[in-house]
C-alpha cells in the first residue's frame, strides 16, 4: 500500500526518507554584512582593507570599513548611527588602538551592551601583521615592534613600510 507521500511506509521507516535539505533544496546560509568602524586612518584601516581584498569578489561588498574622526569612546555611538543608516550591516564592530585609551573597560562594556562587537589592537598593531609572514615574535616595546616589522616588510615585499 502506497502512502500519500509517494513511497511505501516501510521505505520511510527504513531510513530511505529524504532529509530536510533534499526536500527543500540545498540552502546555504548567507554570510552576514559586517561594518567595521575604526578611528585610525593608517594601520588598522589598511589591515582590514587588505583582509577585504583577500576574500572572494562576490563577498567584498559585505565588509565595509569606515574611519571616523571620533574619540575612541564615541566609536560605539558612530557604529550604531551607521547601522541605522545602512541596516543591511547587521554585524557592527569597532576596532581601535589599545595604546593610551582612557576608559577601556567602559568602552567594551558599552559596545557589548549595545550589540556592537569590539576589537582592539596590541600596543603595536604590526605584531598582527607579522602573522601573515609566518612569525609571531615576542616584542615588548611598541617602537621596537614597528621598526622590526618595517625591516621584515621591506625584505618580503621590496617596499618601504610607513606608519604615520
Which positions does each model-derived feature cover?
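Phosphate/oxyanion-binding active-site loops and adjacent basic polyanion-contact surfaces
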Residues: 40-44, 68-76
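Short, basic/hydrophobic alpha-helical segments
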Residues: 74-88
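Acidic di-acidic motifs
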Residues: 39-40, 95
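Conserved beta-strand elements of the Class I
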Residues: 35-37
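C-terminal accessory helical subdomains adjacent to catalytic cores in phosphodiester-
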Residues: 1-33, 45, 49-66, 84-93, ...
